Amino acid sequence: MLEEPRSRPPPLGLAGLLFLALFSRALSNEILGLKLPGEPPLTANTVCLTLSGLSKRQLGLCLRSPDVTASALQGLHIAVHECQHQLRDQRWNCSALEGGGRLPHHSAILKRGFRESAFSFSMLAAGVMHAVATACSLGKLVSCGCGWKGSGEQDRLRAKLLQLQALSRGKTFPISQPSPVPGSVPSPGPQDTWEWGGCNHDMDFGEKFSRDFLDSREAPRDIQARMRIHNNRVGRQVVTENLKRKCKCHGTSGSCQFKTCWRAAPEFRAIGAALRERLSRAIFIDTHNRNSGAFQPRLRPRRLSGELVYFEKSPDFCERDPTLGSPGTRGRACNKTSRLLDGCGSLCCGRGHNVLRQTRVERCHCRFHWCCYVLCDECKVTEWVNVCK
């Protein structure tokens, strides 16, 4: 049952700041990577000094590159929501990563060595890399832009002019170049007429900023730090492995006689799914001395490099325990007909469940206003739900 919405602007908060970072205007042309004029720049005052929890090193990065940091924060925000989606049927469902204006890394579970900790580290690192690289390709960042260029701009323009002239005469004029990253992007078919062009996602810049922002520059001195840096690396590796080739057709009457192609990161949902698969096969690391951080893997280093690792057995997460980053499962909605992990039997840890008529208030009909807030209506939704005792 849907009641009439009541207009009420929510506070800006971290989410509003993040929307300001990346969704403040219509997307620029992804092919050309246009930098449209007229958008006020993000400054240190609007980004760095409004968010608590930045380390000294992160604050320095933010002061030097507030626009890139804003994109990184957006990436963390997206990563937390994707983490919640991927683990929505688990007892621990990433809700503890929502920091209320602080970075997710202040959550207690990220100071532990659980499988869930490993998954969270990889997801957050991937989110920063993905968001920064995407912002680069959209021309939103001062310090970076399009990624790899297959040829000089003059050569590219000359080639395009020759090709368009050939197309206007009803002929094809193939120009093809190899992928800049062998193995990371599918190769064109023999009948394809295409060239690398447009605006590639600058994955190198995104990876470097993710590493600088999240990894400590000092050598890791304990097992927890080594686990964090390793899983950060796995998250970024998954983004690189899932690069896609996107193309735009050119030609008369939509004939697609010629395609301009560029590298792009996939939707973040695909990144989340790939990391969720790695979570299911995460590797437990035995250690001689946790203070020394010495790994005692049972697998070859090459096999270990692309997998999530952890060194603590996870608790059952049934009860609330702030020291473990566990919110517990009391009050969680469950599926009484399911025998899977989202079923009331598993999710409620044997405590049983109640059937409640619940009215919740949710944000709806959101509009972004420049500058600088998101204005939403509040809608009331009434429904019957099964809730863990």
Curated annotation (Swiss-Prot):
Q: Which residues are glycosylated?
A: 93, 335
Main location group:
secreted
* Signal peptide range: 1-28
List lipidated residues, O-palmitoleoyl serine. 253
Report where it is expressed, by tissue.
Expressed in embryos and in the mammary gland of non-pregnant mice.
GO molecular function per UniProt: signaling receptor binding
Q: Which residues carry this modification: Phosphothreonine?
A: 46
Q: Name one GO biological process term.
A: hematopoietic stem cell proliferation
The PTM entry states:
Palmitoleoylation is required for efficient binding to frizzled receptors. Depalmitoleoylation leads to Wnt signaling pathway inhibition.
The record's function comment reads: Member of the Wnt ligand gene family that encodes for secreted proteins, which activate the Wnt signaling cascade. Specifically activates canonical Wnt/beta-catenin signaling and thus triggers beta-catenin/LEF/TCF-mediated transcriptional programs. Involved in signaling networks controlling stemness, pluripotency and cell fate decisions. Acts in the immune system, mammary gland, adipose tissue, bone and skin.
Recorded hits in PANTHER family, A to Z, give:
PROTEIN WNT-10B, WNT RELATED
Q: How does it assemble?
A: Forms a soluble 1:1 complex with AFM; this prevents oligomerization and is required for prolonged biological activity. The complex with AFM may represent the physiological form in body fluids.
Protein name per Swiss-Prot or TrEMBL = Protein Wnt-10b
User: Which species is listed as the source?
Assistant: Mus musculus (Mouse)
